[in-house]
């Protein structure tokens, strides 16, 4: 009888039976799909030989739609029903995109993520992205000749939980099994590292259509370790287009608010061509007629364009400096700078990067394709197609600290920023009041000391805590971040075993706490934050002391003489008078005075408790 053959879990059963998996770069402007063939990653073209799929979806009446090149060609004539740059809307609420520069859409006020009204009904960014992902899936299956087991989809390193979850939802709608969400800079490093057998410290400068990421990676003997990540989730090539768009209108004396939607789209398309032309020419000409009959003829020089976008270029260098500082390295320590994203083709970007790092950036891989290639390599490995030379390890990080709210609106950090993922960390907390039977767990993200200055991610409650005196219960709170960067939180009361948990899927309608700005604020206000934290801690301790004293007096006040009781009341009143003020030293001094003034009272209460416990018991029972 033939023996049954059992392959290693997750591995292809035989070398020739490869499991088909792809890497997808879901971009703001263009999207790509890549796969590993004959041990080499390659971008998969469509039937016309084009590898870039414009991230554009046009909706028609009665459920029809056009995706990619055909939709892009019709964007100027039907702007309200043609959705472009939808990645900028992923995981965002209506309040965050209502003022999106020059967007011709009708945004719908719906719960959660922003919705866009089209001729085919209201659509969410998840649905629009799913159309793009489905098109890439069909392309891959046609090219590879079979169904896919899954895909690695890349996201900006600074995408928050809402944006990552929205991306996974879009993939699910498109019929894709997500093997991993991979940060775009890390994907680029994989492509470069494996292709060139690189080792050392590398910076990945990723300027896409709608986001900017900067990651510092250490490549050593097959280990890809992300040391630090920085970025701006609201800065990309689109912003360079809008800067040029505004300049053209200003030169023509036209107010953008007076333009028809089709003129906005037409002019944006033309200035994008201008921008691309200026990447290889000293000047470029614009000649366009608007629907109003206005005829715009202008010539833009490269120097003019460079001065227009200089503030945007500098915005990319701010998180770059922070990432280097977090990684504790200098520009001179960086062995190479990898450029990612079509926007990095602009000479102003390459010149700025070369000047800052003191070396020309690496450009031997196509910046439009490098992310998809890296994702394909990771997908092939996760699908179980391990071959020789595939013994490498990916260590990614979280961009911002994760913490929990404690009494007084303070933040206790559980997982600090730039921690390698996947990761799990736990910390014990206790109750604040006697008889407390429930605890509210408020999960926050950010670097500041106060909850009000951080981003709220989720809230849940742990109920059923056995009634005990304040401080007796032990609640263990565990934070767990998976390889996709998604967070789960668990709380368990150690004595009773009651527990509660939440998978953090924050509201898609969160206000825009720009992550880069959050980090910048944390550096600028560190001293102020620490003073505020010290004040709140003093106030919380004062409140705890006052409540404990009040409870003790109510229970055992007869243990004090009249003059002793008056002294305790005086000390308590003095503490109460300063407890809500802003003088930390005064609060701490008054708290200490009350603690010292009640020491004798506490000793008498202890004696009373011991006598009560021993009453009526024999010595041999003790």
Swiss-Prot record:
Gene Ontology MF terms in the entry: ATP binding; ATP hydrolysis activity; ATP-dependent protein folding chaperone; unfolded protein binding
Keyword tRNA-binding: no
Pfam families associated with the record: HSP70
Keywords: ATP-binding, Chaperone, Nucleotide-binding
The UniProt record lists the keyword Zinc-finger: no
GO annotation, biological process: iron-sulfur cluster assembly
Function comment: Chaperone involved in the maturation of iron-sulfur cluster-containing proteins. Has a low intrinsic ATPase activity which is markedly stimulated by HscB.
UniProt similarity note: Belongs to the heat shock protein 70 family.
PANTHER family: HEAT SHOCK PROTEIN 70KDA (PTHR19375)
Protein name: Chaperone protein HscA homolog
Organism name: Burkholderia orbicola (strain MC0-3)
């Amino acid at each position: 009888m033939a023996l049954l053959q059992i392959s290693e879990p997750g591995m292809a059963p035989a070398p020739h039976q490869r499991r088909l998996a792809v890497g997808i770069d879901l971009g703001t402007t263009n999207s790509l799909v890549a796969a590993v063939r004959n041990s080499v990653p390659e971008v998969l073209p469509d039937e016309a030989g084009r590898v870039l799929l414009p991230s554009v979806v046009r909706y028609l009446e009665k459920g029809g739609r056009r995706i990619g090149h055909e939709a892009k060609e019709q964007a100027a004539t039907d702007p309200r029903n043609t959705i472009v740059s939808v990645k900028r809307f992923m995981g965002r609420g209506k309040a965050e995109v209502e003022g999106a520069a020059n967007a011709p859409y009708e945004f719908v006020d719906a719960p959660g993520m922003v919705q866009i009204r089209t001729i085919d009904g209201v659509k969410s960014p998840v649905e629009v992205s799913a159309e793009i992902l489905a098109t890439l899936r069909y392309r891959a299956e046609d090219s590879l000749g079979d169904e896919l087991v899954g895909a690695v989809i890349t996201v900006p390193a600074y995408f928050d939980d809402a944006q990552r979850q929205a991306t996974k939802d879009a993939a699910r709608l498109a019929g894709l099994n997500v093997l991993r969400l991979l940060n775009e800079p890390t994907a680029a490093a994989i492509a470069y590292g494996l292709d060139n057998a690189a080792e050392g410290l590398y910076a990945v400068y990723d300027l896409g259509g709608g986001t900017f990421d900067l990651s510092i990676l250490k490549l050593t003997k097959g280990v890809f370790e992300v040391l630090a990540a920085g970025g701006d989730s609201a800065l990309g090539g689109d912003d360079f287009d809008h800067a040029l768009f505004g300049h053209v209108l200003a030169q023509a004396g036209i107010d953008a608010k007076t333009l028809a939607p089709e003129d906005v789209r037409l002019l944006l398309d033309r200035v994008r061509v201008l921008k691309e032309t200026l990447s290889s020419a000293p000047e470029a000409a614009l000649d366009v007629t608007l629907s109003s009959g206005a005829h715009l003829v202008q010539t833009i020089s490269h120097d003019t364009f460079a001065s227009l976008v200089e503030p945007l270029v500098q915005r990319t260098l701010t998180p770059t400096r922070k990432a280097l500082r977090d990684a504790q390295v200098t520009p001179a320590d960086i062995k190479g700078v990898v450029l990612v994203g079509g926007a990095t083709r602009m000479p102003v970007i390459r010149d700025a990067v070369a000047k800052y790092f003191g070396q020309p950036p690496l450009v031997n891989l196509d910046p439009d394709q490098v992310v998809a290639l890296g994702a394909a390599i990771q997908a092939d490995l996760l699908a179980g197609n391990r071959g020789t030379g595939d013994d490498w390890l990916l260590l990614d990080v979280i961009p911002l600290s994760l913490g929990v709210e404690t009494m007084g609106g303070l933040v206790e950090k559980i997982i600090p920023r730039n921690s390698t993922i996947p990761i799990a960390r736990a910390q014990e907390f206790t109750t604040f009041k006697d008889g407390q039977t429930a605890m509210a767990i408020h999960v926050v993200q950010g670097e500041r000391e106060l909850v009000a200055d951080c981003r709220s991610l989720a809230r849940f409650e742990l109920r059923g805590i056995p009634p005990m005196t304040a401080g007796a219960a032990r609640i263990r709170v565990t934070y767990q971040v998976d390889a996709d960067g998604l967070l789960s939180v668990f709380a368990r009361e150690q004595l009773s075993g009651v527990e509660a948990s939440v998978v953090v899927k924050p509201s898609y309608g969160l206000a825009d706490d720009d992550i880069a700005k959050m980090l910048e604020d944390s550096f600028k206000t560190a001293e102020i934050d620490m003073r505020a934290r010290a004040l709140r801690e003093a106030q919380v301790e004062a409140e705890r002391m006052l409540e404990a004293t009040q409870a003790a007096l109510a229970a055992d006040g007869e243990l004090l003489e009249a003059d002793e009781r008056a002294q305790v009341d005086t000390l308590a009143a003095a503490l109460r008078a300063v407890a809500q003020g802003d003088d930390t030293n005064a609060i701490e001094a008054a708290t200490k005075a009350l603690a010292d003034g009640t020491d004798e009272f506490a000793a008498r209460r202890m004696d009373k408790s011991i006598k009560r416990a021993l009453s009526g018991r024999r010595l041999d029972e003790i």
